[in-house]
Amino acid sequence: MDTKIITNPSEQDIDMLARALRNGELVSIPTETVYGLGANGLDPEAMDKIYAAKGRPSDNPLILHIPNSESIKPLVTEVSTTAQALMDNFWPGPLTITLPKSDLVPDRATGGLPRVALRCPDHDGCRVLLQRAGIPIAAPSANISGRPSPTTAQDVYNDMNGHISYILDAGPCIIGVESTVVEVHDDKVIILRPGGITKAQLETVVSTVEYDTALVSTETKPKAPGMKYTHYAPDAPMTVVVGTPESVANTFNELSKGIEGPIGCLVSHETYELIKDDSRFMCHCFGHHGDALALGHDFYKSLLHFNENHVTLILAEGVNDDGFGVAIMNRMEKASGHHIIYK
């Protein structure tokens, strides 16, 4: 199979992609978070193709993407007042809501769980395709399972060429980190996966917002996509350092002693100024120190860049674990295998 990249799609191209999705083919779709690997969310055989292409365990739930909140009605058995408030305030956007599924939704989409994960993406091109397809689209990140998520069409092609039919190219993703996944119980919201919507943002709509205890467990069946098994990992071993630019630079110098070959460094501009003279360091600057949004935008992109350049070690500067930083540090923790140093 030759994978075709569709850039600047015509109306005929959108119709073709919608038809391919309805017919059970795999199409990579752009969103504001990362590129998704799309399949018909009502067709178990189509979703099996996702698991096969990604090498993803089938008990890992999928997110169904829909063009608007009205599309949720046939997919769930109930929508609470709290869930409706979240949709009204954060859709379209990087928020995934899990709700009791209807019989229309196959178990294959939920990993056998009684709740289905649903999201309306904040991406015009994606929503046009979803509307045209007329079906919910199951779409985990369009990468081989365990590797960094793709934020460009080329990233998708590098992992999925020959495994999927089409890639809809809409340029780089704006956010660069996956959606927040929540579960709603009466008037309480539980965060199953941190992401593009922060806890503080949710608290402007719902009074009680908590993190799920399973966020720190690897022993239970995942209730949300991306919360079990190895995720986001680069090819080289990775260590994250959180601290001032000076302490981060000093720690990088200590960790790099005796290392042969290029060392990938994901750093702020301030830290870069302190380590730029070391020729072993291949630096990717994400922005100013502590800028979680900038780090999130560049995180996966930098890991894939380091993979392409075959670095022997990756040293990354982390951020404070608050606000959007919670989502970033969650991804960094997983990518580094929990190798995080606080200075």
Task: Show where each model-derived region lies.
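Active-site-adjacent structural elements in enzyme catalytic cores
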Residues: 1-343
